[in-house]
Amino acid sequence: MRFPLFAALAGSMFATAASAQEVTLRAVTSFAEGTQFSKNFERFIQKVNADGKGVVQINYIGGPRAMPPFEVGNAVRTKVIDIANVTGAFYTNLMPEADALKLIGKPADAQRKDGTFALIEQLHAQKLNAHYLARQFHNVPFHIYMNKKIDKLDFTGLKIRVTPVYKDVVEALGGTTVTTAPGEVYTALERGVVDGYGWPITGIFDLGWEKVTKFRLEPAFYSVEVGVLVNMDVWKSLTDAQKKVLNDAALWLEGLDSENEALIKAERDKQTAAGIAPIDLGPAASKEFLTKANEVGWASVIKRSPENGAKLRQLSGN
């Protein structure tokens, strides 16, 4: 097993009681600890543990060193863990509709008001046995990064590391897709196993990928989605007071997205300083790219889940 720590946890109760009133939930993140897409979750844990003394606490087990990223969704489903920081791209095998989350760029509060969040919650309950507690990073876009410069919108001959987020658009542009865990990307780039990769605008410096990256294709596209999931059996077992601590912290966590605009600007400047050059193919190609990315993204979701995919697209407005 690649995560022996969790083999020991799998047979235990969902949460340990410190007292008659307090429960402790076990948490993992699907991204490396202390990196861009784990940091806010770690702040969330600190807030819960500060505000929830005597009510609810979170025991932070860690990241991919404890559990492979693509196992996290199933670990929530089967109650191996209680709460997780994970992107839907890592559990589309269990919930195909999770691939639509990248196409819904509205703020979380807007999604809560217009019914989008309710449908996403319903789908997680049905297919992942999970409560969808929070969504982060709606205003952080993705890019395709490359080590070979292109002069037209054609990926023929290029091997691009993907998750389900980028797979359809890379293939639509003629590229060959390669799937690896984030921890394997550096070596794949260094050895020429892949010519590029998809990743958000933020976070590559956490992983050292700037050392093996030459170009960033413009424009940015899609929206990052990192959710906080709670096993549904665990969620139902919590008291109203325990749920309130988690719900309040979840809304606070979603509010941290206001920090992202400054982070994105700083990241672009940092990439420029590191020698990562933008590839701008011009307005027509940029429009074609964005249109294709949106259309193939939705087509893939609707093909795998016709009814729910259509509902999600209608709610998304795009």
Residue map of PLM features:
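Sec/Tat signal peptide C-region and signal peptidase I cleavage site
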Residues: 14-20
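Signature of the catalytic double-stranded beta-helix
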Residues: 113-126
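Bacterial N-terminal signal peptides
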Residues: 4-13
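N-terminal secretory/targeting leader peptides
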Residues: 21-110, 125-318
